[in-house]
Amino acid sequence: MFAVSAMRRRRRRILAECRTREAVYKERTLELLSQGVETDDPEFIEVFTSARNAHSDYKAQLRSNMRLEATDRKTKIIQRHIDEQLDRRLILDINRKLLNPKLQLQLDQTEEAILEKEDILAQTIDDITLNDSITNTDELDEESEALLTKWILNQKTKKRPTVAKTAIAPTAHGLQTKVSRNVFITGKDDLVQPTDLGQPSTHEVITCTSRERIIHPDGIHTEIYTTEDVSPTILDDVSDSCV
């Protein structure tokens, strides 16, 4: 390796010397021509001959160096290929268990076994899906429908709007007093009452709160609250009476 590097440095130095010698003689030849020296002048002939020889030497050395570089490039290509083969053989040696001729047969058998198990799994899933479609679990039974209906009715009862009414009442001095009366549905209780058979029964009682607000001419507000428990069946009558 060191010998090759030294040889390359030596050949590059020789090529540079040939190039410099050619440049010097060529410049001297052109200088004589610019001075009007005849081409048959002995001095011109000597300088021109030296320049031509230097040019030939430079070209020969350049071709030699180029051939040398081409040879070196070829050897590197071959060496690179050899190194590649060595690395490939190393990888194959490490994984030599994968080079078993029976490996392909084993792989095929394993793949068939996997596919067979996947088919069994898919068939099981199809059977489960079919059973789920036959058994309709989306419909509600009577007990569930009754419970759902009760919840809906209770929700509507709790969301009853407030009934409000405002009136204008005259006073003894001829002034007007504003009287506002509001009815609120404040809640629902489940009361247990005994029956004739001795069994308790559940009775829904709704609390109806009536608020009467009186605004006097002098700006004084008076509010009167009245609370009354009523059953759902007479809720509308209570609301009308409170108003």
UniProtKB/Swiss-Prot annotation:
Keywords: Host cytoplasm, Host nucleus, Virion, Virion tegument. The keyword Acyltransferase does not apply. This is Tegument protein UL14 homolog. Belongs to the alphaherpesvirinae HHV-1 UL14 protein family. One of its GO terms (cellular component) is host cell cytoplasm. Contributes to the nuclear transport of the viral transcriptional activator VP16 homolog during the early phase of infection. Therefore, participates indirectly in the regulation of the immediate-early gene expression. Additionally, seems to be important for efficient nuclear targeting of capsids. Phosphorylated. The keyword Cytoplasm does not apply. It is found in: Virion tegument; Host cytoplasm; Host nucleus. It comes from Gallid herpesvirus 2 (strain Chicken/Md5/ATCC VR-987).
